[in-house]
Amino acid sequence: MIKNLSNMKNDNQKREKCCEYIEALEEERRKINVFQRELPLCVELVTQAIEAYKREISGTSTDNLYGQSECSEQTTGECGRILDLFIPIKHSSTSIEEEVDDKDDDDEEHQSHETDIDFDDKNMKSEWLKSVQLWNQSDAVVSNNRQDRSQEKTETLVELIKINDEAAKKNNNIKSPVTTSDGGSGGGGGRRGQRKNRRCWSQELHRRFLNALKQLGGPHVATPKQIRDIMKVDGLTNDEVKSHLQKYRLHARRPSQTTPNNRNSQTQHFVVVGGIWVPQTNHSTANAVNAVASGETTGIYGPMVSSLPSEWPRHSNFGRKISEDRSRCSNNGFFRCSSPAMSCSTRTKTKDAKIIS
């Protein structure tokens, strides 16, 4: 920047530029003075730049003065030579004294300026030394602060551990029963006490639930949110409606799934009577009575009695056994058979034969 100023020919422009630079640097120095201890070298560089610009301004002013004096000396010298030829000129004592006084003033100003510079340098050195001492002290302070913080952390951790132990002891000592909506009670700590009680679905609430399902088209079409909006019950949540809807769907599926299983579970029981396989009628009638008493239906038709087997088991001695029974019972006038079905049929036949005879 100083080289650029030296290249400028106009002295007024040089002064204006130097003044602008000096003002800007002074503002920067004011900002840096806040951090003078941390940035001593920056302050020193800025002050040196300000002094350099001031010297540049003083140099331009002295050049102007020297130029004017040289011109005046040249003019006076030429005039003096001309006048010396005609009139002897004598220097007055007052002019000499004034020149001496001016020189003395210039010397004093120069000395005062040098003393100011020396004083500023000494101040900067002292401040720099102070900042170095502060830096050395700051390391020790930082280490002390770290130790203090570590001690505080350990103390706080110990206090927190004590508080947690006391709270755990209190929770173990306190046992409060928590009653639920189902009527059961159980001992528990604070966690069970904070749990939300299950909703008890009353008949009125279930009736509203069924009406909502009818309006929406059935349990497989309706959604929990739609059901809750139609029911309009305070405090009823979507989760509660969802759980109740799932239970209702399972309950609706049970009859259609259990009835065919019950049919298949009714096994056919047979009894061997006189070498003949005969179904056990008591078992079938008992099953029919139990089915009627229990009220199990298929959903469309009423209770049904298990049917007789379509095919009877075959036996090799079936014809021979019947002939033997006929020969034994021919004397009495009717057939006697060990099986109840055959005995009934033979008795009816003999009675009809007697009536005809």
Swiss-Prot record:
InterPro entries: Homeodomain-like_sf, HRS1-like, Myb_dom, Myb_dom_plants, SANT/Myb. Pfam families: Myb_DNA-binding. Residues 96-109 have a biased composition (Acidic residues). Residues 94-117, 171-198 are annotated as: Disordered. Probable factor involved in nitrate and phosphate signaling in roots. Integrates nitrate and phosphate starvation responses and adaptation of root architecture, depending on nutrient availabilities. Acts downstream of the nitrate sensor and transporter NPF6.3/NRT1.1. Represses primary root development in response to phosphate deficiency conditions, only when nitrate is present. This is Transcription factor HHO1. It comes from the Eukaryota. It is found in: Nucleus. Residues 224-249 bind DNA. Induction: Induced by nitrate. Down-regulated under nitrate deprivation conditions. One of its GO terms (molecular function) is DNA binding. GO terms for cellular component: nucleus. Keywords: DNA-binding, Nucleus, Transcription, Transcription regulation. The keyword Phosphoprotein does not apply. SUPFAM superfamilies: Homeodomain-like. Residues 193-253 form the HTH myb-type domain. Transmembrane segments: none annotated. GO terms for biological process: cellular response to phosphate starvation; regulation of DNA-templated transcription; response to nitrate starvation. Residues 171-182 have a biased composition (Polar residues).
